[in-house]
Amino acid sequence: MSTLNHTTSQHEEHAYWGGIFAMTLCVFVLIASEFMPVSLLTPLAADLGVTEGLAGQGIAISGALAVLTSLFLSRLAGNMNRKHLLLGMTILMALSGLIIAFAQNYQTYMTGRALIGIAIGGFWSMSAATAIRLVPHHQVTRALAIFNGGNALATVVAAPLGSYLGATIGWRGAFLCLVPVAIAAFLWQYVSLPNMSGRKNGASGEGVFRLFRQPVVSVGLIACSLFFMGQFALFTYVRPFLETVTHVSASGLSLILLAIGIAGFVGTLLVTLVLNAAFYLTLIAIPLLMAAIAGALILTGHNVWIVALLSGLWGMLATAAPTGWWAWVARTLPEDAEAGGGLMVAVIQLAIALGSTAGGMVFNRLGWQSTFALSGIVLLCAAALTFMLSRLRESASWK
């Protein structure tokens, strides 16, 4: 079996597309596992004898462990074969499903959720670095878009599938159904991924935070964090907006949410072409367009057809954007993509938490219009910083 060292250029190697698609299946199971409790919260809480609020903390603990893992995994893993590390994360994912499915108490359930958090943080932090080593440089954005396609597909089907399985075979059966898919992802990665050596000199003693010394990295990560803050300041509260402002029915709500998911999946299929044609222009345009959508929703929130159309456009743009930011990591830090990926995971998770919290505070105190306005303002700031980032990259290329 072939072995790729840390700096292997895929211009001299053939592409491992089987490995890309195997990892995409793993992404699908990861995201489905992460958000499965959302649609199963009521029966899960009743069975474990806890409140729905406590059961919901299973999502919080997975997010917290994802942040910690993403920040320190590269340093802890040292020169470990990255194929073995990815396979280990996949085993943790399968083990998490088993532990949750057979959990007899709340503590065991939370242990299973902690394991899925470690798998999420580890897997995503290595995604850009792995894509760089599996495909030629000009195909990295496409590979990352395929990863994100697995994310988008899981986002579309996880909640309704979890709800259906929970109603037919119970919440334990729903989690158990993820285990054979995780095993299939493990086997596919085992046969399709090459051996990938880690850094022989290990990670810097300063860890991933040393990257903040580079202005382009600092500005880029702040711009990325503002984008996700602006996105989730609005999107977290789209359901109460649709129910109380647009006054959609239960079936209408499901259809609009499904349309958002489908549009997002389509966006991941198209974004590679746009990024390859105009990379930074695309990263600037996405938050600008989303800010415009936020403003348009304030003006037309009572018109169900316009809201449905704008929501679909929002889903297409918001779901496509992560592909661009992961590609930015691959372009900016090709020799340090693991550390950059770790920072990116932490930044995104924290930005989502901050955005949803700030949006909720404004929603409760000032109303939905102020929440949507806040989202638009933050997204405009993200676009401005991304423009600054493009100038920094341009000036650096002339030096």
Walk through the language-model features, giving the residues of each.
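Helix-to-loop junctions at the C-terminal end of transmembrane segments
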Residues: 69-81, 267-279, 363
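A late C-terminal transmembrane helix in Major Facilitator Superfamily
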Residues: 332-368, 375
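Helix-breaking motifs and short loop linkers at transmembrane-helix boundaries and internal kinks
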Residues: 49, 81, 102-108, 247, ...
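C-terminal transmembrane helical hairpin of 12-TM major facilitator-type secondary transporters
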Residues: 281-324
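Paired small-residue
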Residues: 96, 107-115, 305-313
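Cytoplasmic helix-loop-helix junction between adjacent transmembrane helices
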Residues: 112-150
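Conserved MFS/SLC helix-loop-helix module at the cytosolic interface between two early adjacent transmembrane helices
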Residues: 68-104
